[in-house]
Amino acid sequence: MSFAAFWKRNLAFAKLAILSNLEYRLNYFVDAIVQPTLTTGIEILLWFAVFKGAGATEIAGFGREYYLAYAMWGAFFARICTSWMYEYRMIQEIDSGSINSLLVRPMTFYEYYFSQLMGYKFITTLVSMLVPFIAIFIFDLPTKFERLPLAFALEFYYLILVHSISFVIAAGAFYLNKVYAVTGAKNLALWLMTGELFPLDLMPEPLKSIMIALPFSAGVYVPVGYLTGRLEIGTVWQSFASVTVGIVVVNLIGAWLWRKGVNVYTGTGA
């Protein structure tokens, strides 16, 4: 199989995801604009309350404007790195038996949904980016815009790990009929581990160093910290390395679960 054919096929899957999400425009508007706007507003109010309650001008060496900028960009990056819609679809394909139709086609299950995820995240990023951009300019919050390309590169690289974890969870549907619950538990854990809830450097040692070293910090804390001047480029390269290790380990587990599951699978779909 040539690379050109591989690229065209996956580009078609990505376009399919974009078109299918834009088909219901009101739903997409709520998903891409309203939801991140509300999330950002809640987190900003939270940090206002924290500083007012503490009666301090700085927390851990950073003033209120840095935490407001973190909340703005944090809600945006968290929206990109969160995956549940395609994870649910993958689980449903296996659980219902309709995966049979995918197994006989000239592409892998992983590839089919990964391309759709990336297409969906790409268009959602372009649309929802208006929210933090407008807010940052209105409130004049610290942001190093020249760092955006590298921050986005890390975020979309991290999406490979996100999808790989979703693939592992979906493969669990070969063995469990309540695997949907794992998705909810995983998303709650990542809410903390990515740094969406609060910056990871506010944690006490050694928990702080452990959480930052884990690949999940690449979801929110590292790109947002780098973008707002909280972190320097060395932490970004370390995060790239950590995500790479995570991708290798998780995909090895996923490949093993998938092969074993397919071998014993008895489908009921067409």
What does each of the following model-derived ranges do?
Residues 1-270:
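Hydrophobic transmembrane alpha-helices and immediately adjacent juxtamembrane helices
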